[in-house]
Amino acid sequence: MTPNEQLFKELIHRHRDLIWSVCSSYRFSAAWETEDLFHEVLCTLWCDFGSFDGRSSERTWVWRVANNTIVSLKRRYANQPAPASPPAAEPASQPDDSPALLQLVDSLGEPDSQIVRASMYGFGYAEIARMTGLTVAAVSMRLTRARRKIKRIYEKQ
């Protein structure tokens, strides 16, 4: 095993729960299972492994690659129907991911759904701003508006 392969293996070992959690939090087309998304993210992480420059934390970088990979796949396969039921196995350390809440988050569109998901995973405004390329003020405003919108929709149900 090469040194890069060993470093990559260690990176995945440290962050596999986060990657799995991000993958399982997306309700995708019926053709895509959480495991398929997980493997797509691993492939993207491997391809981008040399691009990590340390400007953000390793955890932030992994989350951003995972989220962006899934968002790209979601755009590419937008015409396929959503799955009938949520994935079965999910780690206990992930945020509240009830299907109803995730459906509300998905309804926000990008980048608001990405911002809310990052907040659900405990990332701060500055980290989310770096992930999305927005200012901290814009992240704060979008997150506040998104939370209000989710609350209004949830209360109507």
Which residue ranges define each predicted feature?
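Arg/Lys-rich amphipathic alpha helix in sigma70-family domain 2
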Residues: S51-D53, R64-S85, Q94, R145
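Structural recognition of an alpha-helix C-terminal capping motif at a helix-to-coil junction
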Residues: D36-C43, C47, S56-N68
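Short amphipathic alpha helix immediately N-terminal
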Residues: S107-R130, K156
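Short, charged helix-capping/linker segments at alpha-helix termini
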Residues: M1-E10, W20-E40, S51-D53, M131, ...
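Acidic, proline/glycine-rich intrinsically disordered inter-domain spacer in sigma factors
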Residues: Q6, R76, Q80-D106
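DNA-recognition helix of helix-turn-helix
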Residues: T132-Q157
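Hydrophobic positions on the alpha-helical face of helix-turn-helix-like DNA-binding modules
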Residues: V41, V65, I115-V116, I128-A129, ...
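Pre-recognition alpha-helix immediately N-terminal to the DNA-recognition helix
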Residues: L18, A100-Q103, E110-Q114
